[in-house]
Every structure is written in C-alpha cells, then in structure tokens.
C-alpha cells in the first residue's frame, strides 16, 4: 500500500536511493532483530527517513512500530525512541492513529521501574503537540511530580513544561501545584531552579502571569542563592517578553539588580535578560535608558560593559530611541575611542546607527567625529593581525559603509583610508577588500573608487595567494571600470593585467572572477576566462555549463562591438546557451509529476538565457522594421491608402506593419521576463530586481514603437515607477538602456518639428533606441551562479497518471464525478546567503482545469488555444511542509479530457508565485446506459 501511493514521488536527482516502502521494510527488519545494536541503528535512522519521505502513511506506520519498541524494549531502546520523537517534532502531527500510539507509550507508566516511567513521561512531553488535552496524561504528570524518585520528578517537570506550552488549561491547572513545590522549604536549590524554569510556560496568559510574577519576585528575597536568583530572573524575563505589558516593570527590576547586586554572575544574568527585553525598546521608560548608560559607565567588569553595549546595540534599532538618545550618544562617542577594541567597535556601531538615522530623517547631526573614530579603529586593528582584531575591524568597516551610504560625501575619504591599509595579508586584507567592494557596489562608486585605484593596481601587480582576496580585488576593479563606462568610453587595455593576475590560480577562483565580470558587464574578459575554463572542465556537466556561459558572454561581447549587426548571431548564441545551461545544471528530466518544462523544473539560468534570446530576436525585428523604410519604400498609393484607413503610419508601407509586429514581439519578451520573475520563488532579491528591470525595459521599448505607429502619438502611461530606481551599481548598469530609450523618446516626441506618422526621423530614433538596447547589460547573480530559482515541490495525484494512449484513459460516466486527491511535499532548498532569509511557503494554491480534446485523428493533441470547461481554485496551508487537497471534477459532454493540476506558492507577504509543478491525467467521459431512460424488457420466470 505504501509503495503504491508513494512511488509517484520519484526523485530526479539522479541519486540511486531506495523508495519509501523499501527503506521502511529495511528499518523494520532492524527493529525486529534480536541484537540491541541493530535495533538502535534502525531507530536512529528514522529521523532521516522522515525528512526524505514526509508522508503521513509512512510516518504513522513508523511511529506505531517505534511505540511497540518503546513498550516491549528495554530502557536503552526507549531512550533512543525518545530522541527520535524529539528530533522529529515537526512530523508528529502526521500520526494518524494517535490513540493507538498513546496507548502503547502510556502502558509503560504502569511499570515498576522509575526510569522507565521517567522515559515514558519525557516521551509524552516530546509529543505534547498532538495530545495537549488528554486528561489521563495530565493526571500521570501530576502523579509524577509527587514521586519520591528524582529521575521521575525531573521527567515530570520536563513534561509539564512541554504540555503547558500547548495547553492553556493544563498550564492554569498546574500553576498552583508548581508554586507550592517552589515555595516548599524542603525543595533543593537545583530542583527549585528547574521548577522556576517550568513556571515560564505555565503562567496561562497575561492575567494569570501577574500572580506568577509576584511569586517569582518574592523568591528573589526568600531564596537568595545564585542559582535560584538566576533561574528567577530568566523566568521573569521570559514571562515579561511573552506578555509584553510587564516589560517596563521587568526592565526596572533588572537594572536595579545589574547596578546593585554584588555577585558577578547575577549581574550578568540581569544584563542578559535586558538584552532579550531590548527587542521591545519602544516600551522602555526613558529613565531606564539613562540608568543603562549609568550602569555601563560605573561598571568595572569588561564583560558587563560589553553586555551593556550589546543591549544599546539592540535598543537603537528602534527609531524612537535614536531620536532621544542624547546621553546614549555621548557615552558611545567616548566609548568608541576606548583602548579595548571590542568595546570601541560595538560603541561605534551604536553611534553609527544613531547618526545614520539622523541623516535619513534629515535631523541635524555631524558625522565627522564618528568618521574619525572609525578611521582610528581601522588603524588600531592593524597593530596586531591576530584573529581577535578581525571582528572589531569588520564591525568598523561595516559602519563605514553604512555611513557612506547615508552621507556620500564621506565615500572618497573612506576609500582612500581603506586603500592605505591594503598592505596587510590574510583575513585583514579580505575584510578591507570586502568593504571596498561593498562601497563600490553602491550608487556612488564613480566618486569613491578612483581614490583607491593606485593601491588596487599595486595589489594586482603582486596578487595574493588567497583566492577570495584576489576575487574581491578583481571585483573592486570591475566596479570602478563599470562606473566609468556609464559616463565615458573606456578601452580594454586594463583587462590584460587582470588576465595576468589570474593566469596561474585555481579554476574555482577564475570562475568566480568570471562571474564578477559578467555581473558588471565586462563580457569580453569573462568570455576569455570561461573559454579556458571550459577546456579544462573536470566533468561533462561542468563543461556544458561553462561552455554555455562562454557562448552567452561571447555573444554579448560581440554585441558590444558590432552593435545592431550582431543581433541575429547573438540571439542564436543565447538560444544555444539556454539548452546547454539547463543540461549543465543537472536539470531537464522534468519534475516528479512527469511534466515537460514547467517553471518548477526549469532552472533559472537556462530560462533567463532563453528569455534573453527571444528579447534579442525582437530587437532585431525592430531594427529590420526601421531599415524597411529605406529598403522597402512605400508604394505611390500608400498615402491614399493611409488617408482612407485613417492611419498615418500606413503611409510608410511595409515598415509600419513590421514595426507593429516588432512591438508585439517586444511586449511578449517583457511578459516572458515577468512570468520568469513570478516563478523564481527562491531567487535572491538582486536577481528578481534584474528580471523586473528587464521586463520594464522591453515594455518601454514596445510602448515606444507603439507610440510611433499609433495615430495620435500621445504619451502612454509611464512605465517607470519608484520601485525601479537603481539602488546598486548593478541596477544602474541594467537600467542604462531604459534611461537611454527614455531620452530618445523625449527628444523625438518633444520636438515640435517632428511630423506625425512614420518618417525617416522616427526610423532613426528606432535605430538609436535599438543600439542603446544592445549595450551589454550586467547579468543577474542567480544566472551567473547557476542557481535554480523555482520552488522545490513534489506532487502525487490519485488516480495516478497513465500512459498516453487514449485507451488507457480513466473512464468517467457523465452522471458521476471524478474525485481527485492531491498530496504534495515542499522540499527544503539550500540557503541563498547569510544576509537574505529564505521566503517561506505560507500557502499552496491548487488550480484544477479540465480541457476537452479536439476531435482529430492526430496522435499528439495541442491544447494551448482550447479554453477549459472547468477551472477550480483552492488554497491549502502546508503543515510541516506537507499539504493535501481534494477536488471533484465533472464534465457535461462525452469525450476525452485532460485534467491538469498545478500548484502555486503563496509567500508570507501574500504574493502568489507560479512555481508549479504541473501534473495531469487523461479521462474519458462516456454516457451511462442506465441513465438514458431506455426501458429494458422485464425477464419472465419462464
């Protein structure tokens, strides 16, 4: 049963692995083994099985088998079953037979062995999320708290904490019980600390929390031992953070302890609590912030001072604190010049946040003192190249980049200061180059980087053995050259020094340099590097991918040299690269549902390459339409025909029709980029911005042609929006063609001497616009990295898809309805980067369509232009990455139908992503003879 239902989730990764049924059978054999070692090995492999096959039927069967082992096995096996339950918490709600699972585990509570009972209590606590309101379990936990065995009591405390987090009724019922145990004089300090930690979850809401807080505060005086006080502080802080309304009182209490308690560990615990409550900075009273500054000033312990600064670091993320941070700013200004570089770095970070906020809100502020402090910190960290100084250096460099972003006048000074420190080696050199690259990636790169150019060239002549440092060095040079190319024409002579510097480095370093060159539109340099890399590729897939990148980069380089004349050849090269890029990424076998080319299967680089090929082909059509005015002059009757048709552009003859067709092709290219952006769920923000910019640019070009060939030539609605303003140097490069087209359009249509219709002046403007569009745009990061942007999702459809011939179609009487059941799994993907979190799947939109087949004898049927007779849409919420849906399908006419099911993701912001995958089955609807109303002869007895 399991194998039949789960085999449709076939994995196309190419890794020879077992299916779910075989894997479960193998683990079951291990569980039934008479050797404890084999049983343990089988038990610990279950979490991996759940991650790979997170299907309810498998998980339910597995947990029932584990419950049997827990009931019949020894304590050692029970311990490993407990670990499996703790590690597989997100899959627990897929257990279907909860009662049977609970019965098998609960039976161990009747054992005479207190360790077995303790393990049972901990196991019940681990699965509290699926049995939160079971009264028999609540009673067992209460009975465990009254036990005379310490192990069982500790297990009951753990179970209490777990159940209280899921059941408010249980939390309220157990609050008095735990309070009595805490106040009991016979309770030991260690046990009391555990009970106090349990009180964090049993407060039962803001109203009930008042009594718990009162109890915990009384414990601070009644039981002054360090362990009890620290446990009470932790519990008080957690409850205040949960209820929010008690944050001001708790902040005052913690500050009082931090300033007056003589014990270092207690003061540290109070400061750690303040660090957690700093997330609610808007609720802090103003005098508490002043007291925090006073505590930091009076502290003689370096660790406590650092904790105070870290609390300030979180507080200043609130704009209200930044606006009224006079004393805080003064303290950080002094601390930023401290001899302790760690303190100075954190204080500088706090001060930078305040100053940047003032610049952004146009408040009066002077960043000169901060600039001096940051420069001094960078120089001070150079005195010792040890690893202890790298962290302060990175904080200072990050602050410099933020300050330059808020106030560009400091950019040149910062670049010069960083370039002066480039003589260092190792991690310090990487940090400095990374800061220069971050500085150059902004909009002020043209003004900032030339100041560092002499030092960068000197470093390039003596390149470091560190591959990452060399890549960063080349990236900074690419940024400087790219920013210069936006305003002037530059020669290619500088590329020789780059090639000489990377000639003898490893292939991975050269590949990263080539990717950076592609991002900043240095296509000829990237093509040279990629050509050599493709000849040295270690595998066939790598050779395909590198060859695809080489062809595409060479096509863009040729486009820069030849201009419009190279459009056709460049389009063909990009088309070839799109096929090779998909194969090189290891994709192309289709998704698990067996579709062909859905957005969930297609890798982002190959799809972007195909879109670029179609866009260049559309530009070639636009250029040909402009030339057609000269190569195919209008006939003599064209003017009369234009007057009769009331179409001024028709006077241009064939050129007008060609221009309109080119406009439609450009609009189609823009729609293709838009569809690509809507399917790239896991793409980084930079890649999505590039796709939106490409969509906007080709939409703008299409509107330009439509305006030329229209009758009124009125100004269309503006395409440029505030969301498409460049924020980085890469976006400036990508938006350069759009800005050029806008200038050409304004020059043409704002000129009063421009005659209406399609004249030679219009043709020259089209050629100029196409030439501007041919300028080599930078590549998106996701395309350079070969990253798949589609969402990883697998679908299984019941009834399962069958072979293509119509004879194998599922039969459906017209009077009946087909019950479709869809099950799917959202698969994890590798993280994009440390700086950008992954988008979360909050919902899955399921679209079911039924499309009739045309009556034809053809073996292959094209359903693109046939409207569906049924469209049903529903949105389901994934539970632990698993989702399921059901849909009834009915048709009203006999024949063959393709029933397609497509999934689309809904992210945390409510945006819909057309990620796929798409799966379908063919059904054959027929009339039921019993419903035709034909009377059948009654058979007689004789």
Give the role of each language-model region.
Residues 1-842, 846-878, 885-916, 921-942:
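Extended, low-complexity, acidic/polar intrinsically disordered regions
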